[in-house]
């Protein structure tokens, strides 16, 4: 993969690039890598699953290492692939993967649990980690408060989160990956980034990411509920 933070160009055919029957080659897609960052159990995996699969996962395993999902969208007639990279929040699972995780990032989604004040207070450390890996403020960033459906358990008020978002020049979204009524809201989070990236990132020819290198399969473990 190229070192520059530019969108990569994927060809939907392989080999010599010729098309059977001599027809026109298939359309090409720009690929944008968006990383989803936050403490464990804030609902990162469920948010990415909701956007890519259109539904809430009933059961899931804890993320170990790095995983990603992708979805193709069409914006202004252009087909774009959005890759959502999700990583384990625990430090012991991140040490060996963090350098690869931050490579060629186009945008960042910071996620906290609205019912867990500690996850909100961890946000500065996640922002600092991004800075340490040379992700500047020029890269589009969004702040997401998850689990807004648990109204009686909210610990992070909107005004506090909005002040933090304004300080760091990020838009704030409050949503629920679980509540089907918030499906359009989850959609808006990632489509907002997709529109920004489409408008500002030039086209560059690059090899698409190697799935074998970035999709880390966890060891078999008992299934657990996705708390989001």
From Swiss-Prot:
Gene3D superfamilies for the chain: P-loop containing nucleotide triphosphate hydrolases (3.40.50.300)
Membrane topology category: Lipid-anchor
Keywords: Autophagy, Golgi apparatus, GTP-binding, Hydrolase, Lipoprotein, Magnesium, Membrane, Metal-binding, Methylation, Nucleotide-binding, Prenylation, Protein transport, Transport
Cofactor section: Mg(2+)
Residue stretches spanning the membrane: none
This enzyme's EC code(s): 3.6.5.2
Modified residues (Cysteine methyl ester): 228
Lineage: Eukaryota, Metazoa, Chordata, Craniata, Vertebrata
PANTHER family: PTHR47978
GO annotation terms (biological process): autophagosome assembly; intra-Golgi vesicle-mediated transport; negative regulation of constitutive secretory pathway; protein localization to Golgi apparatus; protein localization to phagophore assembly site; protein transport; Rab protein signal transduction; regulation of exocytosis
Subcellular location: Golgi apparatus membrane; Golgi apparatus, cis-Golgi network; Preautophagosomal structure membrane
SUPFAM superfamilies from the UniProt entry: P-loop containing nucleoside triphosphate hydrolases
InterPro entries documented for this protein: P-loop_NTPase, Rab33A/B, Small_GTP-bd, Small_GTPase
Similarity remark: Belongs to the small GTPase superfamily. Rab family.
Residues binding Mg(2+), per UniProt: 45, 63, 86
Coiled coil: none
Annotated organism of origin: Gallus gallus
Entry keyword annotation includes Magnesium: yes
Assembly behavior: Interacts (GTP- and GDP-bound forms) with ATG16L1; the complex consists of a tetramer where two RAB33B molecules bind independently one molecule of the ATG16L1 homodimer; the interaction promotes ATG12-ATG5-ATG16L1 complex recruitment to phagophores. Interacts with ATG16L2; however interaction is approximately hundred times lower than for ATG16L1. Interacts with RIC1 (via C-terminus domain); the interaction is direct with a preference for RAB33B-GTP. Interacts with RGP1.
Motif residue range(s): Switch 1: 54-66
Positions of short motif Switch 2: 87-106
Name used for this protein in its record: Ras-related protein Rab-33B
NCBIfam families: small_GTP
Lipid positions (S-geranylgeranyl cysteine): 226, 228
Domain notes: Switch 1, switch 2 and the interswitch regions are characteristic of Rab GTPases and mediate the interactions with Rab downstream effectors. The switch regions undergo conformational changes upon nucleotide binding which drive interaction with specific sets of effector proteins. Although most effectors only bind GTP-bound Rab, ATG16L1 effector binds both GTP- and GDP-bound RAB33B.
UniProt GO cellular component terms: endosome; Golgi apparatus; Golgi lumen; Golgi membrane; phagophore assembly site membrane
Binding residue positions for GTP: 41-46, 60, 63, 89, 146-147, 149, 177-178
Keyword Magnesium: yes
């Amino acid at each position: 993969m190229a070192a520059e933070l530019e969108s990569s160009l994927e060809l939907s055919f392989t080999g010599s690039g010729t098309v059977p029957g001599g027809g026109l080659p298939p359309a090409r897609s720009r690929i944008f890598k968006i990383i989803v960052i936050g403490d464990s159990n804030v609902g990162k995996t469920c948010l990415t699953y909701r956007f890519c699969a259109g539904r809430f996962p009933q059961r899931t395993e804890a993320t170990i290492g790095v995983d990603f999902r992708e979805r193709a969208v069409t914006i202004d007639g252009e087909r774009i692939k959005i890759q959502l990279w999700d990583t384990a929040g625990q430090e012991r699972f991140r040490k060996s993967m963090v350098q690869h995780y931050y490579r060629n990032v186009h945008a960042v989604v910071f996620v906290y649990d609205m019912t867990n004040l500690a996850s909100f207070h961890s946000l500065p450390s996640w922002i600092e980690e991004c800075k340490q890996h040379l992700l500047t403020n020029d890269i589009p960033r969004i702040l997401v408060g998850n689990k807004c459906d648990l109204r009686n358990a909210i610990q992070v008020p909107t005004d506090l989160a909005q002040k933090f978002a304004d300080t760091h020049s990020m838009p704030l979204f409050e949503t629920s990956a679980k509540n089907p009524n918030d499906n359009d809201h989850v959609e808006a989070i990632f489509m907002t980034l997709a529109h920004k990236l489409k408008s500002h990132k030039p086209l560059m020819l690059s090899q698409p990411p190697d799935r074998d290198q970035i999709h880390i399969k966890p060891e078999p473990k008992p299934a657990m509920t996705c708390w989001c």
